[in-house]
């Protein structure tokens, strides 16, 4: 069995961010799954500039050598090498973070024909409104969405001291998400 390069994107970059427990939970469980080679992307560390290329990434036709910025070129290559994507996102003002939207905007065709799943966290809505907007954005980028997302409402109270969710069924939901990412990628591989 071949392993899939699973890109996990943590969509927060602010100082004092608290969602690391959520991102670490996803990363840890993916790393324990023999089907995946994990590429964890912390957008604070990635530190992409604001997108300002002279042409759209979709006009580059998947040729990441057309990027003027070396950061954009490297990011496009990294995305191209992923077989699937899980986005871990907080919710800011009923939507995803600006740094996450910027990272998505930097790349065009390299996103295409990859499964994408969402794990969100926040207050009363648990990041669900951010995921709602991300669904519209990612379908436009050519990603194929896993139907079910995981939303952590009042996430600071949702994990124990070991970084595991208090509700055991949440781990099973994550496993089902992983299964669906693999299933969708296998369909793409057969079709391609």
Feature map (PLM): residue ranges:
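A short small-residue
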Residues: 3-8, 115, 153-162
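Short, glycine-/small-residue-rich phosphate/pyrophosphate-handling segment
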Residues: 112-154, 168-172
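Rossmann-fold NAD(P) dinucleotide-binding segment
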Residues: 97-113
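Glycine-rich nucleotide phosphate-binding loop and flanking beta-alpha elements
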Residues: 93-94, 125
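Short, proline-centered helix/strand-breaking motifs
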Residues: 89-90, 115
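Alpha-helical structural signal in soluble globular domains
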Residues: 25-33, 106, 110, 137-140
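N-terminal beta1-alpha1-beta2 submodule of the flavodoxin-like/Rossmannoid cofactor-binding fold
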Residues: 1-89, 95-101, 164-183, 188-192
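Mobile beta-alpha loop/short-helix "lid" or hinge segments that flank ligand
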Residues: 41-53, 109-110, 141-161
């Amino acid at each position: 069995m071949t392993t899939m390069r699973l890109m996990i994107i943590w969509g927060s970059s602010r100082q004092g961010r608290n969602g690391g427990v959520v991102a670490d939970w996803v990363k840890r469980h993916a790393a324990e799954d023999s089907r995946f080679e994990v590429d964890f992307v912390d957008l604070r560390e990635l530190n992409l500039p604001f997108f300002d290329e002279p042409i759209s990434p979709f006009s580059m036709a998947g040729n990441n050598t057309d990027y003027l910025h070396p950061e954009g070129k490297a990011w496009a290559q990294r995305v191209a090498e992923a077989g699937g994507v899980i986005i871990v996102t907080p919710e800011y003002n009923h939507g995803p973070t600006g740094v996450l939207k910027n990272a998505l905007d930097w790349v065009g065709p390299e996103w295409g024909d990859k499964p994408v799943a969402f794990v969100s966290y926040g207050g009363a809505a648990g990041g669900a409104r951010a995921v709602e907007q991300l669904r519209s954005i990612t379908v436009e980028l050519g990603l194929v969405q896993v139907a079910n997302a995981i939303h952590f409402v009042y996430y600071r109270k949702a994990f124990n001291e070991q970084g595991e969710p208090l509700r055991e069924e949440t781990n099973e939901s994550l496993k089902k998400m992983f299964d669906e990412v693999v299933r969708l990628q296998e369909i793409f591989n057969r079709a391609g």
